[in-house]
């Protein structure tokens, strides 16, 4: 049997290949081991943002305890606005990619530029100490300049007044479009009305929009396209193809909960 010569070309290549395989196994193992922790952190961040949109997130808030006490997740059929109970393992992103669980959006209706959406959405009823519904937090996403922007919007029982918003996932330009994640800008949405007297989506984000005290929010300076993306997201998700049917029913029932 020939003696292994690590200094030969073939020996060097063998060592490199073995080291590469070992490193790959280490990285793969680490990814598998870390995934449960990453999933927990992702879920915790989601809960934190839901609480933040609802105005329940404070400096010393225990996220998991507060979420469990005051938030009730529900699955909604967007076409009817009804709650559904038989949707297992709901994942909005995964459902939106599956033809069996998604809806193709007509180009003329696709204001948020998302092309497909899940047939269902998870909404979050916010309860008080007595178990009464005080608001609902709705997921919202749409394209900005560089990225898909994911956020939450809290709406009061009148199904019209914004109680808060937050963006938790986006890749817009830092210091410009990335300011959609700035709490100071997000506060400018509080108290704004989503709809006009004709029940049309009237909330508008753009340059000088705050002149309309009831419906307007000034866009971000130097981030016109990102601001337009936020505006378009509201126009789509609160219209008839988004949460429009659900909000009509929420308004009719929230006061009775």
UniProtKB/Swiss-Prot annotation:
Cell compartments where the protein resides: Cell inner membrane
Keywords carried by this UniProt record: Cell inner membrane, Cell membrane, Flavoprotein, FMN, Ion transport, Membrane, NAD, Phosphoprotein, Sodium, Sodium transport, Translocase, Transmembrane, Transmembrane helix, Transport, Ubiquinone
Enzyme kind, highest EC tier: translocase
Record-level GO cellular component terms: plasma membrane
GO biological process: sodium ion transport
Domain of life: Bacteria
EC number of the protein: 7.2.1.1
Transmembrane domains' residue ranges: 13-33
One function term, GO molecular function aspect: oxidoreductase activity, acting on NAD(P)H, quinone or similar compound as acceptor
FMN phosphoryl threonine found at: 224
Pfam family for this entry, one: FMN_bind
Main location: membrane
Transmembrane recorded as keyword: yes
Cofactor(s) required, per the database record: FMN
Its membrane topology: Single-pass membrane protein
Reactions the enzyme catalyzes: a ubiquinone + n Na(+)(in) + NADH + H(+) = a ubiquinol + n Na(+)(out) + NAD(+)
Subunit structure: Composed of six subunits; NqrA, NqrB, NqrC, NqrD, NqrE and NqrF.
Family: Belongs to the NqrC family.
Record's function text: NQR complex catalyzes the reduction of ubiquinone-1 to ubiquinol by two successive reactions, coupled with the transport of Na(+) ions from the cytoplasm to the periplasm. NqrA to NqrE are probably involved in the second step, the conversion of ubisemiquinone to ubiquinol.
PANTHER family assigned: NA(+)-TRANSLOCATING NADH-QUINONE REDUCTASE SUBUNIT C (PTHR37838:SF1)
Protein name listed in UniProt: Na(+)-translocating NADH-quinone reductase subunit C
Organism: Haemophilus ducreyi (strain 35000HP / ATCC 700724)
Gene transcribed to yield this protein: nqrC
């Amino acid at each position: 049997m020939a003696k292994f010569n690590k200094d030969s070309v073939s020996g060097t290549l063998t060592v490199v290949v073995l080291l590469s395989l070992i490193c790959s196994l280490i990285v793969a193992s680490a990814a598998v081991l870390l995934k449960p922790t990453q999933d927990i952190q992702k879920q915790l961040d989601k809960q934190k943002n839901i609480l933040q949109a609802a105005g329940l997130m404070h400096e010393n808030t225990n996220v998991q305890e507060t979420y469990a006490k005051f938030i009730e997740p529900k699955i909604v059929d967007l076409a009817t606005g009804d709650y559904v109970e038989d949707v297992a393992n709901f994942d909005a992103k995964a459902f939106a990619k599956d033809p069996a669980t998604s809806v193709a959006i007509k180009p003329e209706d696709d204001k948020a530029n998302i092309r497909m959406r899940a047939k269902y959405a998870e909404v979050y009823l916010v309860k008080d100490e007595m178990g009464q519904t005080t608001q609902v937090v709705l997921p919202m996403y749409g394209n900005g300049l560089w990225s898909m922007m994911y956020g939450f919007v809290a709406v009061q029982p009148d199904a019209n007044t914004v109680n808060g918003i937050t963006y938790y996932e986006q890749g817009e330009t830092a210091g410009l479009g990335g300011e959609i994640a700035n709490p100071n800008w997000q506060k400018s949405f509080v108290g704004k009305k989503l709809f006009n007297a004709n029940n049309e989506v009237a909330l508008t984000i753009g340059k000088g929009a705050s002149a309309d005290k009831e419906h307007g929010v000034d866009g971000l300076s130097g981030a016109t396209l990102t601001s337009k993306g936020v505006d378009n997201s509201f126009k789509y998700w609160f219209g008839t193809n988004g949460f429009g049917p659900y909000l009509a029913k929420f308004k009719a029932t929230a006061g009775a909960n």
